[in-house]
Amino acid sequence: GVRLVGSEMCIRDRYDRVAFNSLEEGTSLTVQNNLRRFGMAEVSRHLAFIKEDIPTLKIRLRRHKSFNIVIIDSFQYTQMTYRDYIQLKEEFPDKLFVFISHARGKNPKGDAATSVMYDADLKIWVEGYVAFSKGRYQGATGEYTIWEKGAYDYWNVAGPKQKGGQA
């Protein structure tokens, strides 16, 4: 799901390149195969897979014409504190950072990740191939289907779940 969101960011804004900082999976063959599997080859010149710790990423982002959108997988693998996050955000105010987090239920795992969630302008929880907005920028429905067939199978075939965590 995250890779498709990265692809969507590349497609929607042809002028920005997206860095997917895959600390958890790295730039392995698995990641490359997923890129092909999800049809992201068409945006590959706008999407770069990297595996860099935060100090190295900061060096990259200080360069002229660096990435304007950075997806970080995952917040826990950065080993950042909330203070580290604030420093990153303040040093690069014109960059969009998307943090993927391990979860405990529908919330990020760990105090620092939870604090980042509360600071974020937009919070997105993904379940069953559907992304749900938890923030104030929800659009018409507050949800975005990432993969139609997967979402159909999960929500309609797998049992009586309620979309969006509604009971």
For the regions a language model picked out, list residue spans one by one.
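Single conserved hydrophobic/aromatic residue that forms the stacking wall/gate
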Residues: 1-6, 10-11
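Conserved inter-motif catalytic segment of the P-loop NTP-binding fold
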Residues: 14-95, 128-129
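Phosphate-binding/switch region of NTP-binding enzymes
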Residues: 90-167
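Alpha-helix C-terminal capping/helix-to-coil transition sites in glycosyltransferase folds
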Residues: 5-6, 66, 119
